[in-house]
Each structure stands twice: as C-alpha cells, then as structure tokens.
C-alpha cells in the first residue's frame, strides 16, 4: 500500500515507521533558503540568504534573523509564518524564566522549551508540524553555543551546521573549512564563503543576513555596511 494513505494523518505511523507529515515538513525546510551557523572559539555566527519575493518588496521589512533574548539569536529555513509563531513562543518562555528566577534563561533550556513546543505539534490532533528548522546561537556561562532544532522536535548541539535547499554543498564546504580554534571574524568569512557556494546571482548585503554574538554576550545583526566590509575582505 505504501505510505501515501498515511500522508494526511499526523498521529499515525506508516508501515515503514515514519510520520509522513514530518517528512513533508522537512521537505518544506529543504526547499527554503539556505541558512547556516558556525561556532567559533570566542562566539557564534549565523547567516542566511534573503531572497525577496519581488523587487517591489521593502527589503527592510524582511528579517530572517531575530533576537530571542539579548544573548540568543535565531535563524530559520522553511516557512516564515511558522518561524514567527515559534519566535513569539520562545520569547514568552524566556520572559517567564527571567521573571521567575531573576536571571537570563540558559541557551540549552530555551532550545529545549522550543523543541518541546515543536514536538507537541507532531502528536496533537487538529494541528500540523512546524515547517521550519531553526539554528539558535547564544553565549552564556557555558560559553558559545549553537543548536539546530528540526520539525520533529529533535535538537542537537553543533560546531557548524547548515539547512535549506543548498544544505549538502554547504555542509561539505563547512566540513572542509571548519576548525575548532577558528575566531569570530574567521567564522563570518567562512559563513559568507559557504553562502556563496551555489548562490544564485551576485551576493551582496541586500540578499544575505548575518548575526553574531561574542564574549560580550550581546547578540546583534550586522548592518549592511558591516556586511559589505566583510564581503570586500573575502573577494
């Protein structure tokens, strides 16, 4: 019979042991724009393509990299509306933790809370899985951290990772270039070079976004002028 008769059932396993709706959610991630993250010795960088649906869209209104807390940022591949829902839920969790314990939420705990929300949407009736994967970058008492969270709710800590439509080329490139003693500026250069692998058209500060966090524990998104400077350095 195959898996097709189970493709509309969220809570029923197919004979091959898959939840087919999660497979479809991963397909949505795989067709999204390429995003990547690199953990350096002194910080973390996340970067993504930012292709606009039309030249008439105001590029300033499209922000793929977001703050979750002052020291945690996130980027996605997949469906933008789903990402915004998860950002809102994650920020609420972080605010509740801060209010209760009077200290910022650890990166690992916020990732776990977000992954729990995503997992609950794989086993509940009347909902569908989130069609996004997330890369979460943070810096806390345990140092720089990079996590990837997938639609199934699974999450892992990574030294460097990529997701989206160019994932295989990007991961191959990262495997060749990554070193554990890499510093933050080197990681930004590597992130740009990784995005250039398979990039359609000319890469510029208008069609990529980069976020970073260092030992100051302040996550920020680079300005177009800063991205232009880094692009000039890797030419």
Swiss-Prot record:
Keyword Nucleus among UniProt keywords: yes
Stored InterPro entries: Ntn_hydrolases_N (IPR029055), Proteasome_alpha (IPR050115), Proteasome_alpha-type (IPR023332), Proteasome_asu_N (IPR000426), Proteasome_sua/b (IPR001353)
Superkingdom of the source species: Eukaryota
Subcellular location: Cytoplasm; Nucleus
Numbered residues of crosslink Glycyl lysine isopeptide (Lys-Gly) (interchain with G-Cter in ubiquitin): 64
Transcription recorded as keyword: no
Gene Ontology BP, a term: response to zinc ion
Keywords, sorted A to Z: Cytoplasm, Isopeptide bond, Nucleus, Proteasome, Ubl conjugation
Subunit structure comment from the entry: Component of the 20S core complex of the 26S proteasome. The 26S proteasome is composed of a core protease (CP), known as the 20S proteasome, capped at one or both ends by the 19S regulatory particle (RP/PA700). The 20S proteasome core is composed of 28 subunits that are arranged in four stacked rings, resulting in a barrel-shaped structure. The two end rings are each formed by seven alpha subunits, and the two central rings are each formed by seven beta subunits. The catalytic chamber with the active sites is on the inside of the barrel.
Similarity comment: Belongs to the peptidase T1A family.
Protein name, entry field: Proteasome subunit alpha type-2-A
């Amino acid at each position: 019979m195959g898996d097709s008769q189970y493709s509309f059932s969220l809570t029923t396993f197919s004979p091959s042991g898959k939840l087919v709706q999660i497979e479809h959610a991963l397909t949505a991630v795989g067709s999204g724009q390429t995003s990547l993250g690199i953990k350096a010795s002194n910080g973390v960088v996340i970067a993504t393509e930012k292709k606009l649906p039309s030249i008439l869209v105001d590029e300033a209104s499209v922000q793929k990299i977001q703050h979750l807390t002052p020291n945690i940022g996130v980027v996605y591949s997949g469906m933008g509306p789903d990402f915004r829902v998860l950002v809102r839920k994650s920020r609420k969790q972080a605010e509740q933790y801060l209010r209760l314990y009077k200290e910022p939420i650890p990166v690992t705990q916020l990732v776990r809370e977000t992954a729990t929300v995503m997992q609950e949407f794989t086993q509940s009736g009347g909902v569908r899985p989130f069609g996004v994967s997330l890369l979460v970058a943070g810096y806390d008492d345990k140092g720089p951290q990079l996590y990837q969270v997938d639609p199934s709710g699974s999450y892992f800590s990574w030294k460097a990772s990529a997701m989206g439509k160019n994932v295989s080329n990007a991961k191959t490139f990262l495997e060749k270039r990554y070193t554990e003693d890499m510093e933050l500026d080197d990681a930004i250069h590597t992130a740009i070079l990784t995005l250039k692998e398979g990039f359609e058209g000319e890469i510029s500060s208008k069609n990529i976004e980069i976020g970073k966090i260092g030992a100051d524990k302040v996550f920020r998104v680079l300005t177009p002028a800063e991205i232009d400077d880094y692009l000039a350095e890797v030419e």
